[in-house]
Amino acid sequence: MSRIVRFSVLVLLIALLGACVAPPTSPSATSMINPGDKIGDFLVTKGEAEDVVYTWEMGCTKQGSAEVYACKSTVGEKVNISAGVYAALSGKTLDSLWSEHTYELLIGDRPVNLAAFGSIDVAHPRVGTMRHWNVVLEAAKPGEITIHDRGKVDGEAFESTMIFTFSPP
């Protein structure tokens, strides 16, 4: 009988200890976005230059007088959502401009951990090599998401909002 009591006490202790384990955490609304994070039906990831569409290739349209743009894409298309830096006409090297620039990117209200994504160089048809943060959005199904960015390059401040609408292919 004492074996059954000891065994029952042991099982009860194990059950109580298991109940004390903290539940798995999910990203909070203010936590930084990292590669592989999902925001609703949108995957935030990195991409290869040749497999990604850049906002300057999309023909985004300005909405009114503010720096707000509407951008249209299709589900499954990989879209780099960051602003690019280029050296054409600046008299400086791209590396110099990149090291001096400041940039902040938010998806919805959440900041993006830019260092975790790294940068990517891409050939632009008019300005030559352009460097972007390698932040890529991919939609699993139709939807809309808002991106806000701001920064400073070569002493020039900028700020914009982009509303991306992903439609069925």
Question: Where are each of the predicted segments found?
Answer:
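Contiguous segments within soluble domain cores/interaction surfaces
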Residues: 32, 46, 50-130
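Bacterial N-terminal signal peptides that target proteins for export
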Residues: 1-9
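C-terminal motif of bacterial Sec signal peptides marking the signal peptidase cleavage site
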Residues: 16-19
